[in-house]
Amino acid sequence: MDKELTVVIPSYNMERFLPKCLESFGMDQLRKEDGTLADALEVIVVNDGSADRTSEVAHQFEGRFPTVVKVIDKANGNYGSCVNVALRGATGRYIRILDADDYFETGECAKYLRFLISLHGAADLVVNDYDEVGASGRTSSVVRYGLPSDAVFPMGLLADGNEMLDIHGIAYRREMLVRMGYRQSEGILYTDAEWHSLPMSQVATVAYRPGVLTHYLVGREGQSMERDRFVGNVGMLEQIAKRLVRDFDGCPTSGPEDGRRYARKRILALLRLIYTMVLLGYMGVRAKFDLLGFDTWLKNNSRTFYDEMESSIVIGRCPFHYVTEWRRRRSDRTWRFRLARLALNMRTFLAAK
């Protein structure tokens, strides 16, 4: 049977988490229920030069499930290099990424595979719900997209809506990625922003299966979004943002219009995040990021994105357009900025209670 789904698992020093991740596919259960269904799944574990037993653990599962699990051992090259090497060897009709410290809802795996098979490749993008869990396994939040689930629908619905899809809730038709020559940046962090932005420009049709499929682990020590690590590596986020702008503007007519509208919206969201973090003092990023240099680069390289780069925060009942204010004054030390930071800190405090 041809592979319907390839799941790529980038793994660096993940011996503690990888067994739970791989067991979550319920491969024994799939074989008992429907042997052909197990054969529709391909799992590629990419060991990114780990110094622990990650490779050994992965090869143990490969020995148990040789028709499903494939292990690639490679020198360390960070997240994007794992995705790139897996893409070259993947055979599934659809492909998705699962971090080694995340895991599937085992009871949903078979249903999800059957859903993919039923599509016969009609959707370029397949969306699922996911939740965020802490180290104890307790769910902290659930992301339900609430999209139409009775039929494949056009990408325009997402382009016109407010949904911001994340890596935990998407699978792409692999042939689409091959056709566009998709390749992720290597040697840096935060390349998941590329995964849920650039391929979207090629999407014309979407399918949605409601129900939590993926459990996303948050709050683990050593994660790339951990405060101190994020602040120290924020320059990598700048590299990602520049690559997204260059690649998107470099192919102005490539892809369906609705796909490009959604991709543009996703890139704008990242740009706005950068300006917000710096100007409103989020996570201490302000001292580590040359926003003036980045803003000048954006103005010189993409006037369209530059002109659309506006964000505001409501102080009292009045919106404060802080990007415009900063560009006009070239300062973020005015009383309005002090009020904006206070308002943001209060909202963050209240949200955490």
Placement of each model-derived feature along the sequence:
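Short beta-strand/loop segment that forms part of the nucleotide-sugar
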Residues: 34-49, 70-75, 100
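Short aromatic/hydrophobic "clamp" motif used to bind/position activated sugar donors
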Residues: 95
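Membrane-interface aromatic/basic loop that binds lipid-linked glycans or pyrophosphate carriers
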Residues: 280-353
